[in-house]
């Protein structure tokens, strides 16, 4: 509106700059037409049905991506305006390469660190939070997708016990207690480090992985470890406190719980090895959990230190 209707050239310049910055960020989040990655506020429907996120419509108008959910006034005004996003955003938004696009950003007055890594076959994004170590909010801090929307994966601490309750944060979205996420390329560690009093006051005493395991071609679940394959992409997920399948039939196929709120999760994605090679390599790599870090001797990256804060 300011870009089109303002009579002040300086204000128009600010408006264009704000739009350019927004669409540059969208281009990093865009994966097959879906806006992924860490978000300041996420709702259950955004996470469970990523093709219907309302903001996907901006990608549709800007780059011709496939999803145009029921829209509202702002995207309509954008579509009718003369504004065109920077040409440099198209390649990033429609990234179609096996070589990863890797970009890190520090944003806002709190210096929030965001990481985006994606190829044509997968997306891996994360964010820090000013609330780390404290009661949480609806922030979505880790987002992974392999293939299409059925291959979406994230880890969080439920903010309430009611699966489809009304609290914020909820069961699927945000964190009741906020972890620290440390990402290195296509790997990350998620640290939950909370005092006994914080743990006792939490409504839910476990963290969980949300993943539609039946959407993957192969899976191996053993104790602390989960191995997955979808196409040529492999995933290794490890929770220090173990992985448990919930008793509820409704949740058993797409949720794994890890008890306690002093816990470390580790996630590694790879598309360079066969599934059997990947399983063998990750079973033999050293994963050492310490109070202030997680040390992993990765078969490809070498020794990686993931700091817990």
Description of each model-found segment:
Residues 1-105, 110:
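Extracellular polysaccharide-recognition and catalytic grooves
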Residues 62-309:
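Ser/Thr/Asn(+Pro)-rich, low-complexity disordered segments
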